[in-house]
Amino acid sequence: MVDSQAVKNTCLASRQSKGFCFYKATNGIKRHLAVDSSGFPLFTYCSKANISDDVGLIEMFKQNLDYFRDKALDMPKTTILLDNGYHPERIRKELEEFYPEIMDKIQFELSPKPSKQEKLAQGKTGFVPVKARWVVERSNAWVERCKSLVKNFERTNANAKLKLCFIRLLIKRLASF
């Protein structure tokens, strides 16, 4: 599952890390996150907030291309769930340009968005996570628990603090067993 999260900048953040996301009306950075079915991170990528979700996903995959190259062709395809902010055809075309065999190893699937009638029937309003996508939304919520990641304090778009947050989370989960 893949998702992005726009995060506001503080006054300490540099101009190089700033961007404005019109969709979420946020001046800052965007964290792109790919998680497994348990919500643990596979890949992370930070960009300016004005970078589209598609471009962020493509860059995240480019940085982790060895993961896909090492995957055997006789293994089942990995299904990547996307929300409606992504355009699978555009992503597929761009990924095939720099690694043509990648579509033999992965497939994209758009998560169906619940209609207003479905929300009303369930008695819910506002943001309702789509079935199976709540896992990546929960992972974004876990990131919000790390105080240094609530806002962007950094001068660069580095992933280090995001990865440290997930390492801490994984250690806590393993220690509880």
Annotate the PLM regions.
Residues 161-177:
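Charged phosphate-binding loop/patch that engages nucleotide di/tri-phosphates or the phosphate backbone
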Residues 5, 41-42, 134, 142, ...:
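Tryptophan-centered motif/residue detector
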Residues 69-158:
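Helix-centered, glycine/charged polyanion-binding patches within enzymatic domains
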